[in-house]
Amino acid sequence: MSRNYPRLDIETFGRHLITTGDLDPIYTALVRAEEAGDFSVPQLCRWLLGYWCYYHAGVASFLSEKEGEEFWHWMMVAARNEEETPAGGRWPRGHERRHYRAKIAVDSVTSLQARYGDRPENMALYVGARATEDERLPFRTVSARAQEHNGFGPWIGFKIADMMDRVMEVPVDFDNAAVFMFKDPEKAAMMLWEQREAHKYPENAKPKREAILSGVADYLIGRFADLAAPPLSDRPVNIQEVETVLCKWKSHMNGHYPLWNDIREINGGLEPWAGRCSAARAFLNHMPKEQ
């Protein structure tokens, strides 16, 4: 990937992500696929489970077409990674789930099958279960449920909570502590503060970390207050979207994230699968387009 591209300020960069679908293209494609009738709710839930394990849209699309015992068979084939995929080559893992392999993956799939039997879609339904339709779930509740599962740690617990809120329409309440417990958004927030605010303070009067992070979050939420949160557009942008903007902006400034990066990478991973399964073709069709 070329590092030769203009670096954008965080507001310009964030607005691009939010308004073009490049913030979380996976979320947009899933919501569109379900709304178009290409994915039923059970298939969507199986897609999510496959994605949370392997973090690859092509693999998740292929797995989503399988039900019951067949789903677990292919989940284990992917976990063991001893056979070629239907698209050719090894079973991929996204970078964020690169450690989900070998014994960790095999043990995880074994325990998931033991828990959910012939209804693998029940995993997603469990982590987002509510007592009433109007109940809002605390982030920590959803994350804790996710982390009950072998091979699921704090980071994927955060991602699952975010996807339950933005894709499955289960309202989840996040707070700054949930977002800034990971190093990338914290480093990005501190980098932005150094750019904008550090010169205003003597070195011995620098605010505490929590105050800096809270101030950056509030600042960005205010700057994006006129934008609706994708893909549902059901509320203004809040801390969840700010977390994604911060992470991607840090990569952007370090030369690893040109505009349209995620859309290009996801489409590239999907294309070999689109010729092998209808779910991958539908998903690819619903992906946001580079403009």
Swiss-Prot record:
An example molecular function term from Gene Ontology annotations: transferase activity
Q: Does the keyword Cell membrane apply?
A: no
Catalysed transformations (reactions): 5-phosphomethyl-dUMP in DNA + glycine = 5-N(alpha)-glycyl-dTMP in DNA + phosphate
Effect of changing residue 247 to A: reported as: Complete loss of enzymatic activity
Q: Which residues form the active site?
A: 243
Assigned keywords, A-Z: Host-virus interaction, Inhibition of host innate immune response by virus, Restriction-modification system evasion by virus, Transferase, Viral immunoevasion
The keyword tRNA processing is annotated on this UniProt entry: no
Q: Which GO terms describe its biological process?
A: symbiont-mediated evasion of host restriction-modification system; symbiont-mediated suppression of host innate immune response
| Mutagenesis or variant effect for residue 243 to A | Complete loss of enzymatic activity
- Primary role: Transfers glycine to 5-phosphomethyl-2'-deoxyuridine (5-PmdU) to produce 5-Nalpha-glycinylthymidine (Nalpha-GlyT) as a step in the pathway leading to thymidine hypermodifications in the viral genome. As a final result of the pathway of hypermodification, 5-aminoethyl-2'-deoxyuridine (5-NedU) substitutes for about 30% of thymidines in the viral DNA. These modifications probably prevent degradation of viral genome by the host restriction-modification antiviral defense system.
Q: Which family does it belong to?
A: Belongs to the thymidine aminotransferase family.
The protein in question is named Glycinyltransferase
Q: Which organism is it from?
A: Pseudomonas phage M6
